[in-house]
Design a protein with these regions (language model features):
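Catalytic core of membrane glycerolipid acyltransferases/transacylases, capturing the structured
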Residues: 74-132, 192
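Short amphipathic alpha-helical segments and helix-helix/interface helices
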Residues: 66-70, 115, 169-170
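Non-catalytic C-terminal accessory region of glycerolipid acyltransferases
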Residues: 2-55, 98, 120, 124, ...
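Short hydrophobic/aromatic-rich motifs at helix boundaries and adjacent loops
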Residues: 18-19, 36-39, 60-62, 85-88, ...
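Generic preference for hydrophobic/aromatic residues in regular secondary structure cores
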Residues: 58-64, 100-103, 210
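A short, well-structured juxtamembrane/interface segment
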Residues: 51-75, 84-88, 93
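Conserved beta-strand termini and adjacent loop/short-helix elements that scaffold enzyme active sites
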Residues: 62-64, 106, 128-131, 213-215, ...
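Residues that cap or initiate secondary-structure elements
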Residues: 65-67, 84, 109, 159, ...
Length: 250
């Protein structure tokens, strides 16, 4: 599965703001593949299905976590495990006021399909990955944060191992001084794919218990130590990480 590691919603960089902010367009590397024509059109029914699927889910959270999710006075780096990415669009829509969202996807052919899908689902994309075109991708993410937008990071993407927190995931937040919002999700009923991350597909209309932890920028000064601490906190709010599996794979 290609890596969607970023989504962005408007939030004030130095002061609270409620009006949408349009970030400067990130340059798409020349090597990035694209999908167009009938192939793009063929994705539309699938994108609509997944949007309706996501909206059917029943998110449950505590008042404290809800306040952290919906705090908009500064941009944050939202961190969640790769196998929770199905929830990303709904997190933006429900908790980040549904503002325009950005997804970082690979510059490969697989990423081209994912980029086209995200576009049809109402999300915009930045192309790049940790393995190819990484410098351009990092620069684009920094630009998004400095424009006053949130970014999302999957610290075990794009190829795993599953739940292996890579210290490099903190680079963008450290360069901009943005705090982290660690996201946890516990599924009442879900399928899991036979992918490297055992990707979760919550069953329609099922309940998802959402958790989050706010980490201030000051806690990121020492990258290696911060990565160990943050990885532990992210595992703590995702209970299945401590289990051998979360359900029968598809």
């Amino acid at each position: 599965m290609a890596k969607p590691a970023l989504w962005a919603t408007t939030a004030g960089l130095n002061s609270p703001r409620r009006d949408p902010v349009t970030p400067p367009p990130a340059a798409v590397p020349a090597e990035a593949r694209a999908i167009g024509g009938w192939r793009r059109l063929a994705l539309w029914p699938f994108a609509l299905l997944l949007k309706l699927w996501g909206r059917s889910l029943r998110f449950v959270t505590t008042p404290e976590d809800l306040r952290a999710f919906t705090k908009h006075d500064e941009p944050v780096a939202i961190v969640l495990w790769h196998n929770r990415l199905f929830l990303s669009a709904e997190i933006v829509r429900r908790y980040r006021q549904g503002r325009p969202a950005y997804a970082l996807v690979s510059a490969s052919q697989d990423g081209a399909w994912l980029s086209a899908f995200f576009s049809l689902a109402g999300m915009r994309t930045v192309r790049g990955s940790s393995s190819r075109l990484g410098r351009e991708a990092a620069t684009a993410l920094v630009g998004v944060l400095r424009a006053g937008l949130d970014v999302g990071i999957t610290p075990d993407g794009p190829r795993g191992p599953c739940y292996d927190f890579k210290p490099g995931a903190l680079i963008v937040a450290r360069r901009t001084g943005a705090p982290l919002l660690l996201v946890g999700a516990e599924f009442e009923s879900a399928w899991q794919l036979r992918s490297w991350d055992r990707f979760y597909l919550p069953k329609p209309f099922s309940r998802v218990i959402m958790r989050c932890t706010h980490v201030p920028a000051s806690a990121l000064d020492q990258r290696e130590a911060a990565a160990v601490t943050i990885a532990g906190r992210l595992r703590a709010i995702n209970p299945d990480v401590r289990k051998s599996g979360g359900g029968p794979p598809l």
